[in-house]
Amino acid sequence: MRRLIATILACVLAVVVVSFVLIYHYRDKVEKVFQMTETDSEAQSLTEALVPETEKAAPSTETELPLQTETEAPETEDPSLHAEDGVYTFLQGPVAWESKAPYSGIWCESELDGGLFSVFGCGLCDLANIYSTLTPFECSPLDMYWLARKVSDYSPGGGSGAIDWPYMKETLQKTGFEVRLRKKDRRYEKFQEAISGCLTAIVLISSEEDDSYWQDTPGHYINLWHYNPETDQIFLGDSGNPKHNRQWVPLRTIYDAISSQNTWQYLLVTGYDEEKNTWKYSGIHEKWTRPAWCKAKPEAKSLLMPAE
């Protein structure tokens, strides 16, 4: 019996000893793992401390600018779209004068040499446009009527009374302009080239050739200005129609309507020499509607004749 008890106690003691040994061994292992973890953490902290500033996401002390998106450059306005402000475009009809339309005047209801200016005055309006726009002077269509009577054989008596090409050429040359008379070009590109290379042009149109823009107009002089190659348009002076006057119109529309029944179809003004201007008259003394953008030019007496 005593042996049995001793054996049991010996076994219990052995179990206790083994347990203590195992516990101590496990505790030592856990402490080593914990120490290694702390060492790794310290090493990581040390590594972060040694990272250059450029690699660290440090907060910026500068004020951040807002993101800029790419914007288109502002469009440059075509100067030719504003050049028309200096262009004179006189009107000839009584309806325009009744409404006091810009560039209409008392000449719209005048009777000269037995004819109505409203019937025959388109070419004279164009001549006055050219003289008043391209020189330091200005005149009315009536002034141009008297000048044409003075320097050429023009007379409105009989027929339509409209001034013919040779008389327009003579009158313009007397006022210092270089002028060329042309026939309608067979190719539109040639007409386009001629218009783009001149200061201004007078063109004879007819609705019998093309009635898309003009109707019931067997023959009528119009004035072309400031050809725009980007849009292939011209600034139109149309003395017979206030709705057409001072509008940008496709040059092709003009070409299609050019009359083919006359010896000449259009006139080009290619230059101006003030020394060759034998008139140098300036002043519009008739009642008329001067637009706000059309400033009066200094007056000057005629070198050829007094104003009538």
Model regions and ranges:
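Extracytoplasmic/periplasmic, Sec-exported soluble proteins
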Residues: 114-123, 136-139, 159-164, 183, ...
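Extracytoplasmic/secreted envelope proteins and their assembly/folding machinery
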Residues: 123-131, 141, 145-148, 165, ...
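Solvent-exposed loop/turn segments at secondary-structure junctions
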Residues: 129, 136-138, 151-156, 185-188, ...
